[in-house]
Amino acid sequence: MKIGIYTLGCKVNQYETQAMEQELTARGHELVDFESPADAYIINTCSVTAVSDKKSRQMIRRAKKNSPDAVVAACGCYVQTHEKEAKSLGIDLLMGTNDRARFLDRLEEAVKTRETVADIDDALRRRTFEVLPAGGMANRTRAMLKVEDGCVNFCTYCIIPYARGPVRSLPMDKAAEQVRALRAQGY
């Protein structure tokens, strides 16, 4: 299956996209440029500002317009915090900021069945850290390793606690294991 991915937002989104790309490649899928014809498109959205919300909507609409027969899947903070609005965009698969492995399973299923799926949990109830494979990004000399997710400060201007949930950390043994794996890859 050919899949195009577009990532908006922060280093966390970039890291999570890189982990999804690794898994998709391991599953035998071909990654293509977002503007190229594909069977499915993934938009990893952002919601830190109104501008990022707008860009998320624009990229979803662009994928739908450029390839009406493709499955359009969206994940990330915009989908997590604006579920009703995101559903109105005609997305085939909506999942927020959690459970990337299940997201990819659902994507493969959506391409086969053409059924619309919305699976967004309550971020504020999360208590475990989602362990994703560490790895380098294409054309980068530095690898990223996510060791923490979420926030509990609830600043009046910030949506992150609602998008990402409470603070959760990568267990120390898993962090050490991933650092060793990155070192073995030459980072």
List each language-model region with its residue ranges.
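Proteins enriched for Cys/Gly/acidic motifs involved in redox and nucleic-acid/cofactor modification
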Residues: 1-187
